[in-house]
Swiss-Prot record:
Biased composition (Basic residues): 9-18
Task of the protein: With S4 and S5 plays an important role in translational accuracy.
Protein name, per record: Small ribosomal subunit protein uS12
One cellular-component annotation, GO: small ribosomal subunit
GO biological process, one term: translation
Keywords on record: Methylation, Ribonucleoprotein, Ribosomal protein, RNA-binding, rRNA-binding, tRNA-binding
Protein source organism: Thermobifida fusca (strain YX)
Modified sites of kind 3-methylthioaspartic acid: D89
Record family assignment: Belongs to the universal ribosomal protein uS12 family.
Amino acid sequence: MPTIQQLVRKGRKTKVSKNKTPALKGSPQRRGVCTRVYTTTPKKPNSALRKVARVRLSSQIEVTAYIPGVGHNLQEHSIVLVRGGRVKDLPGVRYRIVRGALDTQGVRNRKQARSRYGAKKEK
């Protein structure tokens, strides 16, 4: 513990928190254009083909974004909405594509957690 004299001389340092989504530039979401849509494999204990897209954002930064849900209609030059949120088993993927916004369709035949996947209520 510092003495009062040390605190008078130096003072307390405030912790600087690291920005987890720098490419969004403080926005909740950003629009972007898909430059490449592909699949990749997750880290060690898991095994799958995760769908991801390389997206050039309106802030002129290119990021890798995860495409959530079962099936998608994205291809090169699709306009997408990107939000923050990392995928734990994909290194370097710190953004997600918003389903049901802009060119991205919602997940078909989805009954639960529909708002997360842009699925409309079935009549």
